[in-house]
Structure formats: C-alpha cells, structure tokens
Amino acid sequence: MPRDFKKVLCGTDFTEHSYSALAYALRFAKLADGALIVAHFVHVPTDDIYAHEEWPRTFEEASARAREMLAELHTTRLENYPKTELVVDIGAPAEKLIELATARQVDVIATASHGRSELVDLIMGSNAEKLIRHAPCPVFVVRRGVG
C-alpha cells in the first residue's frame, strides 16, 4: 500500500514528535518514488485582543523563520530528497492541512498524534483527530515514542 502513496503530505511543528511522522512520510515518498510536501502553519490567534498592528510583522518574521527551519529540515532530516516541496502558510494547522491535501490531491497525510500544546489538544481536540475526521485521504498517525 505505501507504494501507492505517490503524493505524501506531512505537517510539522518542529518538535521531535513531528519529526517521527516526517520520517515515515519520507519513507512513503521514497517507496513510491513520489512527491513529499512538508508544511508548517503559523497559527493566527482569533481573539480580538490580539488585533494589534504588530501582528503582521510578527507573522512575517515567524513565516521567514519557519521557511529557514524547513530548509534546514530538508538537508538534515529529509536527506535532500529531490521531490520535496516546502510550504509555509498562516492558519490553523488541521484546517490548512485539509485544504492543502484537497488542493494537491495527496494520497496520504502523515502526522504526529499530538502537537506542541497538549493542553490545547485536550480542550479543543488534537490536529490528528481533526485530520482523521475530515481529511480527503488516509491519515497515518504516529504516536509519541514511536519512530
């Protein structure tokens, strides 16, 4: 079945746990000699108290830093895999991954079971849970400590 995954999507929050999912995503892409899309999303606070003129600059800085970190990942963890596309965008990770998976018609999404904030996961539900419920393709979930 992984040989059928010609287009693999993996989101990262730059934690070791997300790197485990990234390792599986790379394996799937290599098995199929397919494309690997690695994405990071800068989260936008939705509360009005955050409506501040500094946010656009902060998001630009965060996006620039994320692009640098993805480029470093491409070299260090993705072995410069030539069929890799690096994506940085602004928005809620689960929703943006679903949008990206739909737009790019990916065959599988690889994700870590929990993100950076376990408290938010507990209250709002994890990104993995949202992906499982709404993704347009299979979702491969890597639990903490596996990889």
Which ranges hold each PLM region?
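A short acidic, glycine-rich active-site loop
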Residues: 55-68
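General small-molecule cofactor/ligand-binding pocket signal
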Residues: 37-39, 85-89, 140
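Glycine-rich, Arg-bearing micro-motifs that act as flexible, cationic patches
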Residues: 108-130
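Short secondary-structure boundary segments
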Residues: 40, 112-114, 143-144
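Short, hinge-like loop/turn segments at secondary-structure boundaries
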Residues: 53-57, 103-104, 127-128
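Structural beta-alpha unit
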Residues: 1-3, 75-109, 146-147
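Small/aliphatic-rich secondary-structure junction motif
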Residues: 2-53
